[in-house]
Amino acid sequence: MPNGGSDCCGTCWFNSENNGEQGYQGSEKKGVAICTIRNLEIPNPFWTYCANHPHKNQNKIDLPLGPVYINDGYPYSRKVWVNPPDNEEIRIKLLELLDKISNQPEFKYPSETVLIEEIIKQLTALKEKRAIDGLKRIINFDIEDYRNQMNFIIRNKSIIVGQAIESLLEITNGEFIDEVEKFINYGIEDNSTVNYYQENDNFAAIRYHLVRGLKHCENPKAKELLMTALKDPHNEVKAFANEILNNKNEC
């Protein structure tokens, strides 16, 4: 059974053993499980995952989206097993899906593999410049409603904004640093750490991804922003800023 998450190949409608339906009906079959959209044999389907699973892909998109992941050990983390294929049809679908990402609240399935995040990650890996306008649109989402959100079954869209920032910087080698520098203190504008709690910082992901994106920027402003991030109250943001700044100073 899928102790690493029920969003696995074992329950997927693209598992050849499930006859086009989602569920556990193929779990007792003795045949080889094949992913019908990737033409990929799945040796351990209940510990293998991708973004095409029905928990995330309710429209049953039958083009491979993102990589295939396998279990990476306790506590149920995942690692890439097979990278996604690349062709123009897939790129067009990714761009279409990018344009459909909205700021509307939505329920989230508790999984490391999230369709809208995989869309951005795959376009980034492809260095797909046609994604630039879509990423800029996401960066301009009004996410103020998520500042104090504590409902953990609602997706925090600030994560998507952060990923779009990092993606934009990586795809363009920092060309849009002037447009995203305003996010370096987003969520901690009052500079007060007296009542700061990391677990309540819903906008830390924005600063985190901005800092990660700065490693792709040769603009001197990148170092200035990293110096600012060294004072960030969130430990991960601060640690990444220190690591990236040290790497830049060694160059």
Regions found by a protein language model. Name each.
Residues D232-E236:
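Short coil/turn segments at helix-helix junctions and helix-capping linkers
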Residues N87-R91, I132, I177-E181, A222-K223:
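Core helices of alpha-solenoid repeat scaffolds
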Residues P45, E175, K221:
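Residues that form or flank phosphate/diphosphate-binding pockets in enzymes
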Residues I34-R38, K223-K231:
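Low-complexity, intrinsically disordered Gly/Pro/Thr-rich segments
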Residues M1-P84, I92-L95:
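Cysteine-centered metal-binding/redox modules
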Residues V68-E88, E96, E106-E128, R137, ...:
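Structural detector for internal amphipathic alpha-helices that build alpha-solenoid repeat scaffolds
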Residues L94-K100, I138-R147, V180-T193:
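Amphipathic alpha-helical segments within extended alpha-helical solenoids and repeat-rich scaffolds
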